[in-house]
Amino acid sequence: MPRPILATIHSAALRHNLERVRQAVPDAKLWAVVKANAYGHGIENVFEALRGADGFAMLDLAEAERVRQLGWRGPILLLEGVFEPRDLELCSRLSIWHAVHCDAQIDWLAAHKTQNGHRVFLKMNSGMNRLGFTPERYRAAWARLNALPQVEEISFMTHFSDADAGAGQPGISAQLQRFHDATRDLPGERSVGNSAATLRQGDDALVRCDWVRPGIVLYGSSPDYPQHTAAHWDLQPTQTLSSRIIGVQQLTEGQSVGYGSRFTAEGPLRLGTVACGYADGYPRHCGTGTPVLVNGVRTRTLGCVSMDMLAVDLTPVPDAGMGSEVTLWGRASNGAVLPIDEVAEAAGTLGYELMCAVAPRVNKTID
């Protein structure tokens, strides 16, 4: 029989979170962002639950092809555009929209021979300083695209650097001002709102655009944790990583556990060994005290996470033993929830990373 570790994808939670975004921006169309294999959930596992979106957005053509193969006939957007000229042929054939963020991509379009016009999102670098044309160069890039017979439709986009951080509204306002100054009289749809801007600013006039691009919120993680929890935003966990107790040890005072003896018992302590380790995607740098649920009861990890196992304190769960359910993050069978953001905080990272890091050897199921 397989190891008891399992990742469960919750379809109802995905639908709930999508609707939560709809409520925040009722007048906008939604790109459901499924990059990084739907944040580690698996595109095929989330597609049915998210097909209520107006479009799907991702990074590469392989993911776009998978969405088309699942039967999606609506808009698909490549958020980073094409990576080489030959990608344009597949974009044309599969009717895939793509971002344009540099002169090279415009050059490739100009040289591309096609009978099907391309729909593009011209990206502005309004302050993120990763991809896009600066405000000073943006209109010239638009003019080049607008002159190309290969381009059927031009829309406009930018990406916020501080929507989830302390800069908050002032940071958003500065970037939006640059974006609006450069595009205010240009025809075409606009897209600016990421997860944090969509929930934190809602249907504010500053961020109201034709399209929003929710990502992490669809998967039940707070876009601005620890300022706000997922529960604050009425988001539900869409991924549960669970396993079982496969061994029980009784420690006495002075005994330690695991590599490096990083935890030493200060008195009698009952310990459970869990079939989950860093080779499954659980963060190795989670130390003693990382929250975990056993039979739906909150307790803590003990010592060092090893490749295939970790240890938990069974003191708060006296009825736990061999085979007891362990929830590493997500929803336990009794309905108790351990937010992925709390585990990520203990590991010094983000919920995004934990979702994406679940290893291929962990079986996935959909409920």
UniProtKB/Swiss-Prot annotation:
Cofactor needs: pyridoxal 5'-phosphate
Catalytic residues of the enzyme: K35, Y259
Keyword Plastid part of the UniProt annotation: no
Pfam families linked to this entry: Ala_racemase_C, Ala_racemase_N
Pathway(s) where this gene product acts: Amino-acid biosynthesis; D-alanine biosynthesis; D-alanine from L-alanine: step 1/1
InterPro entries: Ala_racemase, Ala_racemase/Decarboxylase_C, Ala_racemase_C, Ala_racemase_N, Ala_racemase_pyridoxalP-BS, PLP-binding_barrel
Domain of life, source organism: Bacteria
UniProt catalytic activity: L-alanine = D-alanine
N6-(pyridoxal phosphate)lysine: residues carrying this PTM: K35
Function as written in the Swiss-Prot or TrEMBL entry: Catalyzes the interconversion of L-alanine and D-alanine. May also act on other amino acids.
HAMAP family xref list: Ala_racemase
Protein name: Alanine racemase
Name of the gene encoding the protein in the UniProt record: alr
